[in-house]
């Protein structure tokens, strides 16, 4: 396919048009009075959202050069979302401001490489200063404030704060769609995995269709159990103790399953069998987690252990186990707290090393199950459209809160960026490098200016006053008042603000140093369908 090439000014101008189209669509959502954007969906109702990255990902422009510019800025939003989980609109606004300002100077004859150096220098100073003014997040109230600001909803803030309090900072908090109108929190304490009973004859509560075992022993193995002879010795020992038994195995079938069911129905003893969770190496790791949590051992031939040789000492224990058709929950495992802590640290180390998003998610889940539990926020709304929009907002709020716990908080509403203004302005630089610093200075005013504009105010007036106010004092666009932002609960996670600035600068520097752009030449459609050969054309 033939290619079309554009050079220097022409190339950058074409890409800038794409940058502006995307950024203008995204930036209207910024601030407490930000507007929504409606996205067409090929199937189902349209999606209404104010989430920057969701909007950016939807935009495809017809002109290939404009589209490349748009995609570059979409990359800023996407990268910020990956790192911090929020702040995508701020990142887009910063990137657009740096690109526009930089392009003016490049057009006027400045050297793009000098500008790039200046931008990098300024951003490094700004990031250091942001870290210096960052405050650690303390208590449930601070967490609720961060979440409420991100979701623009105080009720959501309280829910997330409660969820984090219940399952700890390492706990897993997931979002599900609720059947009703209300948004509520459901916490599963203990370890839960997605495997249910092998046979419905094992249930103890026919009304709830679940098997509840009080103070049971837990047999953990990675083998398939089909012969009753294999587990007979351990069954006899458990029966003597007069306590129920949970069997976690690759599978329980045939004669072994029939014997367990018959004895359960006769009331001789109570045993429930479930399949082991996960697959392959992940299954081995999860079985080991369960063993450590319950104080038992994994009986595996790989470790030279046979089921026949299992004793009561090899079994795990818990205060309660609830098994439904789909899930098994182990509450209060009797494992040694030191071993559990060591296992948690081991998983944390793996988390830091992994590069796979899927592995990270699975390790995070395992960590949560060992550390305390899983919280589920069930999102409710009146219509499907509102539900999708609300779910996206809560997801952002959740990411924002995690980022705040990790790196602390700074004043929100663009105030923190204005607070680092003087430090960046004090950088000593000359020539084009100084121009790069000025570009960053102009860009860090932009979020405040945009927040003021969406609130129907003159942005420049707010920006100029902010430069003279003492640090931490900012403009609350929701009420139109000047307040101490942190005291008023208007805060941003440091990680979100830092990532937005770094990613915007990175893409702006790449954009300004672009000298040629290559795109596919659109094929001309000659029109009309060609007839099939020897058939006199199409009918």
From Swiss-Prot:
Main localization, broad class = cytoplasm
First-tier enzyme category under EC? isomerase
**Which parts pass through the membrane?**
none
Q: List the disulfide bonds.
A: none
Query: What Gene3D superfamilies has UniProt attached to this entry?
Result: GroEL, GroEL-like equatorial domain, TCP-1-like chaperonin intermediate domain
Listed under catalytic activity are: ATP + H2O + a folded polypeptide = ADP + phosphate + an unfolded polypeptide
Q: What induces it?
A: By heat shock.
GO CC annotation: what is one?
Answer: cytoplasm
CDD domains according to UniProt: GroEL
Q: Name one GO biological process term.
A: protein refolding
Where in the cell does this protein reside? Cytoplasm
> Mind telling me which SUPFAM superfamilies this protein's record contains?
GroEL apical domain-like, GroEL equatorial domain-like, GroEL-intermediate domain like
Alphabetical list of Pfam families matching this protein: Cpn60_TCP1
What keywords would UniProt list here? Answer: ATP-binding, Chaperone, Cytoplasm, Isomerase, Nucleotide-binding, Stress response
Which GO MF terms are attached to this record? ATP binding; ATP-dependent protein folding chaperone; isomerase activity; unfolded protein binding
Question: Where ATP is bound, by residue?
Answer: 29-32, 86-90, 413, 476-478, 492
> Please, which domain of life does this record's source organism belong to?
Bacteria
Which PROSITE patterns does this entry report, sorted A to Z? CHAPERONINS_CPN60 (PS00296)
Q: Does the keyword ATP-binding apply?
A: yes
Q: What EC numbers are recorded for this enzyme?
A: 5.6.1.7
User: Entry's PANTHER family?
Assistant: 60 KDA HEAT SHOCK PROTEIN, MITOCHONDRIAL
Subunit structure of this entry? Forms a cylinder of 14 subunits composed of two heptameric rings stacked back-to-back. Interacts with the co-chaperonin GroES.
Chain's role: Together with its co-chaperonin GroES, plays an essential role in assisting protein folding. The GroEL-GroES system forms a nano-cage that allows encapsulation of the non-native substrate proteins and provides a physical environment optimized to promote and accelerate protein folding.
Q: What's the protein here called?
A: Chaperonin GroEL
